[in-house]
Amino acid sequence: MSLLKTLAPKAGSKHAPKRIGRGIGSGMGGTATKGHKGQLARTGGTVRRGFEGGQTPLHRRLPKFGFSNVAFANNFEIVNVGQLAKFSGEVTPESLHAAGLISKGAVKILGNGELKTALTVKAHKFSESAKKAIEAAGGKVEVIK
């Protein structure tokens, strides 16, 4: 015999839907939970979001404020000096992209890590520690626009 037919929801977990407007005896008749008269008692009687009955709404009473710099921000792709150790000769944004270190955009080289080979590094920006590390290894730093 299957146990599936004996399965039932836990007692008290199921509620019958409220049958609104189906006679006074139901307890939900008469005004059908809408109160007496007025706009909200009518069909389609909702007011739009933010409407305050004709009073100037809060979002129009308060002034605009703030500024977003997102459109003008300079977002640099970050590469550390230690990640340049696998390169030889010249390092450019194109070679960094080909190696999968950056996706696109301007590049900033930071000074974390060690560099033992002399490299010519071309990037849009360098930190002071990155410049020192590259030049200490016998390399050159070139800032590109």
UniProtKB/Swiss-Prot annotation:
Which regions are flagged for Basic residues bias?
12-21
Q: Name one GO molecular function term.
A: structural constituent of ribosome
Q: Which InterPro entries match?
A: Ribosomal_uL15, Ribosomal_uL15/eL18, Ribosomal_uL15/eL18_sf, Ribosomal_uL15_bac-type, Ribosomal_uL15_CS
| Region span, Disordered | 1-55
Task: Kindly state the subunit structure of this protein.
Answer: Part of the 50S ribosomal subunit.
- What function does the entry list? Binds to the 23S rRNA.
Point out the gene that encodes the protein: rplO
Protein name (record): Large ribosomal subunit protein uL15
